[in-house]
Amino acid sequence: MGICASVFLLTSCPSGIKTGVKPSSVNIGSKSSATGISYNQKGGFQVDKKFSGQLTGPNLVFIEGGRFTMGSLEEDVLGMHDNVERTVSVQSFYMDETEIANVHYLEYLYSVQKDSTQDFYESALPDTTVWKNDLAFNDPYVEQYLRFPGFRMYPVVGISWKQVNDYCVWRTAAVNQQLAGSDKVKEKKPKKGAATAGTAATAATTRTNTTARLTIESGRVLPSYRLPTEAEWEYAAKAMIGTQQEDENQINQRIYPWDGPSLRQSQGKARGTMLANFKRGRGDYAGIAGKSNDGAIITTEVYKYPPNDFGLYQMAGNVNEWVQDLYRPLSFQDFNDLNPIRRNEKLDKASRYDSKNNNSLIDNKVRVYKGGSWSDVAYWLAPGTRRYLDEDSATATIGFRCAMISAGTNK
């Protein structure tokens, strides 16, 4: 009997794959399983047969997606009722292991200053005056925090939501250029006075030679770095994967990114030590000398405390983190239950908007931030809590980390 004579073998023969093996995204075969036409012939359809799965970008950790209960498990002490518990699912994705540190942002500023316009460089600078306070002597941080080597691995602060998105555009292009091996490509600096709109990627996108020849189809171009959605961030912070036993039933929920109600290590040699950088109470940022609680008066290094069960550091405390979502107090009513996000579009009936007498602080420019900071009490360390700020504003308590889709795989 010929190999292709049997009916049950016909489906595997045209693909050029070993008998009995079905084509997959990483083992596509030498021929189309739909037409039988060979791939990669001269003048024919080309596929990259070296593809073995999405590359993991620098600093990224894989987060296996799934179902979880989104929303705050803490008592709603402010009476906001803006994060009611509901069940949603998120697709697998990648997230930065740590918050973006000062040294990472300085790398970005160096590239922008070298390859972009002066106007855009100035617009990318963090607002270091966020440390100023009329009734507090924080002046040294204004000059030292961003650039002094002792703060290199402290989270960058004083950056707006818009600045963060520009950083993500640059980082995507810079990482893909590095992966393409085109570091030595000669670049052109934009002419003085050129338009600055959309120039976040100028520092990397002007490197067009090798990078431009790589396409999405090659599998060697990473998807875009971006801010995580609120659902992704909360899912990654809770890290309920650490509570799984024999089946998919979750017996316990988590208030914080770790088990239990305590903010201290409950066992081992580190028993009694703090698990996050936060403010214990009025005037108490770190305890007393010799018996420091969390070991940090302001922010601290991004690897300071133990990671959660996904391997992510500082998902509670240190600095709050921007997420993609627009803030709406009733987002839970509008959310899709798969990969939910709240965008700028108006979802309510037009009759419900009063454009003439709109005095609310909530508009299409306010963005959600989460996680709690060095200046927040423990209540805000719970992943389900949420606050908002104008996308053009910045504070000394908000930083960020990036995320990326996991294309074509859930594990």
Predicted region positions:
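Mature N-terminal segment immediately following signal peptide/propeptide cleavage
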Residues: 55-72
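Short loop/turn microsegments at loop-to-beta-strand junctions
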Residues: 58, 223-224, 306-310
